[in-house]
Amino acid sequence: YFYHNTAECDFNMGREKRNYWHRYSTYRTDAGDVDLFLIAGPSIRDIIERYTDLTGKSVMLPKAALGYLGSSMYYPELPENSDDAVLEFIDTTHEEDIPVDGFQLSSGYCAVETEQGIKRCTFTWNNKRFKDPADWFAQMVKRGIIVSPNIKPGMLLVHPLLEEMKAKDMFLPASDDNAGVDGLAVGTWWGGPGLFVDFTKQSTREHWKQYIKDALLRYGCRSLWNDNCEYDSMVDKDAKVYFEGKGSTIGTMKPVMSNLMCQLSNEAIEEYDPNCRPFSVCRSGHAGIQRYAQVWAGDNLTHWDTLKYNIATILGMALCGVSNHGC
């Protein structure tokens, strides 16, 4: 069964027992219609093939996506010279004959000074940690590394670009029953309250791609890590969503935002460098996310137990059509 609906929902897979009838399953959704697809087999492989006929096949990623992609919050969080520390890490892997093809750059690179202290602010650079982003990207490319900087769809209320983005009408409006801030919906975010970008509006999508180009691609970046895009911290589930002029709520459209964010990352890279094959990484997504990104399952520990859990997670995601998955 494929229940095609983007609103928050609940599955009861036989967990309730009654004396009057046999175990049963239920599906409930908060809003919208349900397109229910019954996908015939007979084999699991046949079902997955037909499911991806509906939702889309996996995006063709660059070869680097198949290799070891290093990642650590430690290096970008250093008080200074994070750029040198990452280069030293890559050099060490080469010296130890550990093949590495990419590096996921966590959000410490954009943690800048604000009126409330150091805060993560997407589309900015901490120049104490990364002195010359263009030179650093060039050094990483020279070492054969594709870098995926972390970007987030939420902007703290102390973000230096917040007023500029508000003037461009990029954020979700608050619901009628919630005043928000200047009429905009406020959610909890890394470091405090923030506003969330509405990717269902064409003008916002164009502005977002331009920010990507100006803050990252012009320095040599050709891959993006789309993070924290679940919109789960948007407590006001009735916050308004533009939805191409038709109007909706974030409670109904939440998973669509992840897919759109990844689609925009790919479009921005393709527009900036038509000869480049985009590589997007994402932590969440709706059915069809495989068309745009490689998905990861969130933070884990460097431990053998994690590896055991990862195998089950990767296989489970593949059964959902997401073959390009890493943990």
Segments from the language model and where they lie:
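Catalytic-domain carbohydrate-binding cleft regions of carbohydrate-active enzymes
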Residues: Y1-C327
